[in-house]
């Protein structure tokens, strides 16, 4: 049984596609974006009011008809601050649709999903609290849709507590991610590859079955080589989150160390000066990491676009090859039904046998290609890199500047971690030297 709080999910039913206002990643270059993500309500209102389109409003009007749902924003605490974009999106939509905003339902904990990778998103889905009015209809709104887990979890909380979520809308999303509900073909693919073990693991770990996942979430399960691989990825993501908390606390301690009195610094000798210098360097590195947050968000959001596009491409190729296999099998059956009789000329039989061999070879070639495509889709086989790897290569080739910024940011993060480890080691060494001096003083002051 997991010790982590569990998000809620509900059966999908006929839940409609999410209404998006713009393309994934389109907000990050807006002048108000960073301030809005960090808690500036005025910046968020200006951003949303300027960008919300008439088409978005019209689509929502069509979905709700004459109903009067309450608009509930994802009120989340981001790593950079209190994200105000969903709240202001709710305000603007409520004004244009003649509806009311629901502010009693809030996210219970901070999961910092903006810019996070897929494993973190699978491992940490937000939970919510607040009064749900039984029988009341709602519209869920958020700033960004990536895999859809946040919207699915908020919808689950509302529906499991007696409400009804009619629709969802976001400022930005990839077009291929708008149909949240996991498709029967996806579930069949997971069960075919992993059997019932994946569903059992998910129920044990998260409290709901794979049929309540989003299509984007389920795709990662289908692509995994095994249930154990997914289990390890979830555990690694949770361990990484714990380590981040520890690193944050270490950085806080380092900053506090800069406030020690001159007398204390002097008593520490050169080791104290070294620690102070290290702490100051850590502060600089920490600031650089904070400033690099937009790079991480842009990189992850852009990569999500490429991954989805690559998934779509592989799906199209698979469907096309399946059609070609079916046609080739039909041709072969037709050819076999027209086999020469016993009294046919030898040359007629030879020509038929040659034609049959050619058609069988063609069918075998198509099967081989189909197997290769499926291996790529599932991330299996020695010649089948994962779709994520293929998407990453293409994205980095298409946008070398973003790739360079990402690499620089990752290098800064590695330097920061190394500095933190060095500082901790020097602190321990200073403490050991201090203990040694204390013991020496104690011995020298002993009466003879």
Swiss-Prot record:
Listed Basic and acidic residues bias regions: 421-437
Residue numbers spanned by region Disordered: 243-273, 411-448
Positions with biased composition (Polar residues): 262-271, 438-448
InterPro entries in alphabetical order: KfrC-like_dom (IPR050043), PRibTrfase_dom (IPR000836), PRTase-like (IPR029057)
Compositionally biased residues, Low complexity: 246-261
SUPFAM superfamilies per the UniProt record, alphabetical: PRTase-like (SSF53271)
Transmembrane as UniProt keyword: no
Domain of life of the organism encoding this protein: Bacteria
Keywords from the named record: Plasmid
This protein's record includes keyword Cytoplasm: no
UniProt record similarity statement: To H.influenzae HI_1407.
Record protein name field: Protein TraN
Gene that this polypeptide is encoded by: traN
């Amino acid at each position: 049984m997991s010790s982590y709080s569990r998000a809620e999910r509900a059966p999908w039913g006929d839940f409609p596609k999410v209404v998006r206002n713009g393309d994934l990643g389109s907000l990050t270059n807006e002048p108000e974006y960073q301030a809005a993500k960090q808690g500036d309500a005025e910046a968020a209102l200006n951003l949303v009011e300027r960008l919300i389109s008439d088409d978005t409003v019209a689509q929502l009007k069509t979905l709700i008809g004459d109903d009067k749902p309450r608009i509930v924003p994802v009120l989340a605490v981001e790593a950079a601050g209190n994200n105000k974009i969903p709240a202001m999106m709710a305000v603007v939509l409520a004004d244009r649709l003649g509806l009311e905003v629901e502010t009693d339902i809030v996210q219970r904990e901070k999961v910092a999903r903006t810019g996070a990778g897929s494993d973190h998103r699978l491992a940490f889905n937000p939970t919510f609290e607040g009064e749900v009015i039984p029988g009341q209809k709602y519209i869920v709104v958020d700033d960004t849709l990536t895999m859809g887990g946040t919207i699915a979890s908020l919808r689950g909380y509302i529906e499991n507590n007696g409400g009804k979520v009619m629709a969802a809308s976001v400022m930005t999303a990839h077009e291929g991610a708008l149909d949240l509900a996991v498709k029967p073909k996806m579930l069949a693919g997971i069960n075919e590859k992993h059997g019932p073990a994946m569903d059992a693991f998910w129920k044990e770990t998260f409290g709901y079955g794979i049929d309540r996942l989003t299509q984007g979430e389920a795709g990662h399960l289908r692509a995994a080589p095994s249930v154990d691989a997914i289990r390890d990825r979830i555990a690694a993501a949770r361990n990484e989150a714990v380590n981040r908390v520890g690193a944050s606390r270490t950085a806080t301690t380092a900053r506090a160390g800069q406030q020690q009195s001159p007398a204390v610094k002097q008593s520490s000798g050169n080791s104290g000066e070294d620690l102070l210098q290290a702490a100051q360097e850590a502060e600089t590195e920490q600031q650089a990491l904070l400033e690099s947050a937009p790079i991480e968000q842009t990189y992850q959001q852009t990569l999500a676009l490429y991954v989805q596009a690559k998934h779509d491409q592989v799906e199209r190729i698979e469907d096309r090859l399946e059609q070609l296999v079916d046609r080739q099998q039909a041709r072969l059956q037709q050819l076999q039904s027209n086999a020469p009789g016993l009294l046919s000329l030898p040359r007629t039989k030879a020509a038929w046998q040659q034609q049959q061999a050619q058609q069988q070879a063609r069918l075998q070639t198509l099967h081989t290609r189909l197997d290769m495509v499926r291996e790529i889709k599932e991330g299996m086989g020695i010649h089948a890199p994962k779709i994520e790897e293929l998407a990453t290569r293409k994205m980095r080739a298409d946008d070398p500047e973003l790739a360079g910024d990402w690499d620089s940011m990752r290098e800064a993060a590695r330097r920061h971690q190394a500095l933190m480890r060095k500082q901790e080691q020097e602190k321990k060494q200073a403490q050991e030297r201090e203990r040694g001096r204390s013991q020496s003083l104690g011995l020298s002051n002993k009466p003879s």
